[in-house]
Regions:
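Basic, nucleic-acid-interacting segments
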Residues: 1-314, 325-327, 331, 353-357, ...
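Amphipathic alpha-helical segments in well-ordered regions
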Residues: 66, 243, 364, 368-372, ...
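Core structural elements
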Residues: 201-213, 287, 324-349, 358-376, ...
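Extended, non-catalytic structural segments that build the interaction scaffolds
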Residues: 304-311, 318, 349-354, 390-402
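Structural motif
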Residues: 328, 352-361, 401-402, 459-462
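M16/insulysin-pitrilysin zinc metalloprotease superfamily fold
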Residues: 354, 361, 369-384, 392-397, ...
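Strongly charged, low-complexity linkers/loops
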Residues: 381-395, 404-475
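Short, amphipathic C-terminal "tail helix"
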Residues: 463-497
């Protein structure tokens, strides 16, 4: 509860992460997105009589990796259970999941948010209940064809491995829910657990929302509502905001508290911008869980866990700290690099390792490299210039062999001619070193032509000399702006002018 609302919003998220495996959880069917409907199916994922599932060990490895990164306790013994319910896109009539012995227990994820009282930025730890493996359902598609309702089922997705990560109800606003989902997606993508493509359904979320009111010294809670069909950060934020307002109005009208009205499952209508009633929410007993007789339990040894632990060491949180503390990046600069993915951060680190200064490397990464990637819809892996070559160019600028403007021209040459060396790129620009005496003569000419700059500098405006760089470049495009300012300053301070 804060000063803006008479209630406290309580939110828990269930994030469904589609694991990045080549085949499904219990069969060899491909998980590739975009295939023709119902072409990536077999007797196992269709649930045909006599078919038997075989566990995909890669899914276990990725689930353990995620659990370690989320600070969970990894279960040495876990098993499979059947979750029984009927839905058109669930061909077997049950979902193979994990009920009482999930592969990952507890854990937490830290997010950036604001203190509700002071408004200051803080780091908040959100506790997790569990993370368990299960198979995905198929996909129902509803269209209007020739004026009639047309519903079709695509079972290509049925059997794809999912990791469902359940948080405690510790999120307090729509903004926090969005921040949590953003950080979760980033972490899962960084570790190669999912591709994180929300448009393709690789990461989806359900939100459990209710409100807490203070009445006569007691907390009164509204019935919990689960919101389905949240497939974007904006959808999560909008749905939680809408549902909070809806529950507030409903509570004002009815006064019904938790336990006095059934839990609901509501779907999010992104076009209408509202939640819509789907059904009363089921309890675990309604699913009639029982152990799957076709699958043996999973027993994890320390050797299997060790493999996943080694792959979970480089997290976004660890990289944020390294970029800020080791390379002196500003927090917003570090965040921008991290949001681009692990490959971009590694490219930056390689630049510094090859000898580029962190400050200049940051500037060129944020401006030139990322601009190229965005304009060409490219990944850092396809960027035409290696980190070693770009570092060599940046070091040439540091050594005053060329200035930043000419350096960007050289960069353009190297992009246009992949494989062109830094030396050849600089040579192709016709850059020649300007003799010191020639440069001093040029600076004397500049000061003679611009006496107002001398007056401004003597009056304490140290940046006045920057205005001489443009005229200097017109006289000789190869001059170094830094040297121009240094020589002009020396000439003024020595009394020459």
């Amino acid at each position: 509860m804060n000063s803006k609302t008479p209630y406290k919003t309580v939110i828990g998220l269930e994030v469904h992460v589609q694991l990045q495996t080549e085949t499904k959880l219990f069969c060899r069917c491909s998980t590739q997105f975009g295939a023709a409907p119902n072409t990536q199916v077999c007797p196992v994922c269709l649930g045909l009589p006599g078919s038997l599932p075989v566990l995909n060990s890669k899914a276990i490895e990725l689930a353990v990796r995620a659990g370690i990164a989320l600070n969970c306790v990894i279960a040495p013994f876990t098993k499979w259970d059947r979750k029984n319910y009927f839905y058109p896109d669930l061909p077997k009539g049950y979902q193979t999941s994990q009920f009482d012995l999930p592969i990952c227990g507890g854990g937490f994820l830290e997010i950036d948010t604001q203190d509700p009282l002071s408004g200051q930025p803080i780091r908040k730890r959100i506790a997790l209940v569990r993370a368990h493996l299960e198979e995905d359902a198929g996909k129902s598609m509803h269209d209007e064809v020739a004026g009639r309702a047309d519903s079709r089922i695509d079972l290509n997705r049925a059997g794809t491995p999912l990791l469902e990560i359940v948080s405690e109800p510790e999120l307090s606003s729509a903004e926090e829910a969005k921040s949590y989902l953003t950080e979760m997606r980033l972490l899962m993508m960084f570790l190669g657990i999912t591709d994180g493509n929300m448009q393709e359904g690789s990461l989806r979320a359900d939100a459990n929302v209710n409100l807490h009111f203070e009445r006569d010294g007691k907390t009164v809670a509204t019935p919990i509502v689960e919101i389905k069909n949240l497939n974007s950060f904006r959808a999560v934020e909008r749905a939680v905001l809408y549902e909070s307002n809806r529950q507030f109005v409903l509570f004002q009208e009815t006064g019904l508290a938790i336990g006095q009205s059934p839990k609901q499952t509501r779907g999010w209508n992104d076009v209408a911008g509202e939640t819509e009633m789907q059904r009363e929410k089921e309890d675990s007993a309604d699913y009639r869980y029982f152990p799957c007789p076709d699958l043996v339990p999973v027993v994890l040894g320390e050797s299997e866990i060790k493999i996943s632990r080694a792959a979970a060491t480089t997290t976004p949180a660890a990289l944020r700290k390294s970029l800020v503390e080791t390379h002196a990046l500003k927090p917003n600069e570090a965040e921008t690099l991290i949001q681009q993915g692990r490959g971009v951060v590694e490219y930056f680190e390689n630049l510094v390792q090859e000898g580029a200064s962190p400050k200049r490397a940051t500037s060129w990464m944020l401006q030139d490299v990322l601009r190229y990637l965005n304009e060409n819809n490219a990944s850092i892996e396809t960027y035409p210039i290696s980190a070693a070559s770009l570092a060599k160019l940046l070091m040439a600028i540091e050594a005053s062999k060329l200035d930043t403007t000419r350096g960007k021209e050289a960069l353009g040459k190297m992009i246009g001619q992949p494989g062109l060396s830094v030396e050849k790129a600089i040579e192709s620009l016709g850059i020649a070193q300007v003799d010191t005496s020639e440069l001093e003569s040029l600076c004397m000419q500049l000061l003679t032509e611009n006496p107002d700059v001398i007056d401004k500098f003597r009056a304490g405006n140290n940046k006045a000399l920057i205005s001489l760089v443009g005229p200097a470049k017109k006289k000789n495009k190869n001059v170094d702006p830094r040297q121009v300012q240094e020589i002009c300053q020396r000439l003024i301070e020595s009394g020459t002018f």
